[in-house]
């Protein structure tokens, strides 16, 4: 039996309205709850961010670079629980105990395959120093740690290599880390 994945629909204030099948929500462009996790580490050269290149077989944005992982919380699941679950499912990361919810924003982007991302996206962060990474090849084509400078240069020179939501996620994380 195939279990339908559902997303939590929200209003413009982020309040839950109900559920909709995930692919239908993306065809309709329905506003729904999502999260983007970005792990960072401090090195002698500065802060680095753990990025993944989405697997080519993903239902959208395959092959593009993005934050460590992203998805949608299930009904009754907190954003932190969902973020930790997807870190394990996508990146094979276990042992991280918590994520900080630092910001949220709404974005709408028309994607490939006639899909529309319209999300109330929460930005979740944690220090990812010394975590073992064993990516799931169905989710992740590649991964690497990027410096802030390399990311800013990549976004300026080749924005088409990154997902639609990533520039906003990165800006919120940079602002948060520079205020600490």
Curated annotation (Swiss-Prot):
Cofactor stoichiometry and binding remark: Binds 1 Mg(2+) ion per subunit. The magnesium ion binds only when substrate is bound. Binds 1 Mn(2+) ion per subunit.
Chief location category: cytoplasm
Name of this protein: Isopentenyl-diphosphate Delta-isomerase
The species this protein was found in: Photobacterium profundum (strain SS9)
One record GO biological process: dimethylallyl diphosphate biosynthetic process
Cofactors, names only: Mg(2+); Mn(2+)
Lineage, highest ranks first: Bacteria, Pseudomonadati, Pseudomonadota, Gammaproteobacteria, Vibrionales
SUPFAM superfamilies per the UniProt record, alphabetical: Nudix
NCBIfam families per record: IPP_isom_1, PRK03759.1
EC top class, as a word: isomerase
Keyword Magnesium (UniProt): yes
Entry-linked InterPro entries: Idi_bact (IPR056375), IsopentenylPP_isomerase_typ1 (IPR011876), NUDIX_hydrolase-like_dom_sf (IPR015797), NUDIX_hydrolase_dom (IPR000086)
Pathway linked to the protein: Isoprenoid biosynthesis; dimethylallyl diphosphate biosynthesis; dimethylallyl diphosphate from isopentenyl diphosphate: step 1/1
PROSITE patterns xref list: NUDIX
GO MF annotation: an example: isopentenyl-diphosphate delta-isomerase activity
Binding site for Mn(2+): 26, 32, 72, 117, 119
E.C. designation(s): 5.3.3.2
Compartment(s) where it occurs, according to its Swiss-Prot or TrEMBL record: Cytoplasm
Catalytic residues (positions): 70, 119
Family: Belongs to the IPP isomerase type 1 family.
Catalyzed reactions: isopentenyl diphosphate = dimethylallyl diphosphate
Residues bound to Mg(2+): 70, 90
Role noted for this protein: Catalyzes the 1,3-allylic rearrangement of the homoallylic substrate isopentenyl (IPP) to its highly electrophilic allylic isomer, dimethylallyl diphosphate (DMAPP).
One family name in Pfam for this protein: NUDIX
């Amino acid at each position: 039996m195939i279990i339908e994945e559902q997303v939590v629909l929200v209003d413009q204030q982020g309040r839950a309205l109900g559920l909709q099948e995930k692919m239908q929500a993306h065809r309709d462009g329905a506003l729904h709850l999502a999260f983007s996790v970005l792990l960072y580490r401090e090195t002698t050269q500065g802060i680095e961010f753990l990025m993944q290149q989405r697997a080519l077989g993903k239902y959208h944005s395959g092959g593009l670079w993005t934050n460590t992982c992203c998805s949608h919380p299930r009904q009754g699941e907190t954003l932190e629980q969902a973020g930790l679950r997807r870190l394990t499912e996508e990146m094979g990361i276990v042992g991280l105990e918590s994520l900080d919810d630092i910001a949220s924003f709404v974005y709408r982007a028309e994607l490939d395959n006639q899909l529309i991302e319209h999300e109330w996206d929460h930005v979740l962060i944690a220090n990812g120093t010394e975590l073992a990474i064993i990516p799931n090849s169905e989710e992740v084509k590649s991964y690497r740690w990027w410096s802030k400078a390399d990311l800013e240069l990549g976004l300026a020179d080749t924005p088409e290599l990154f997902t639609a939501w990533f520039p906003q996620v990165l800006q919120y994380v940079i602002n948060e880390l520079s205020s600490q």
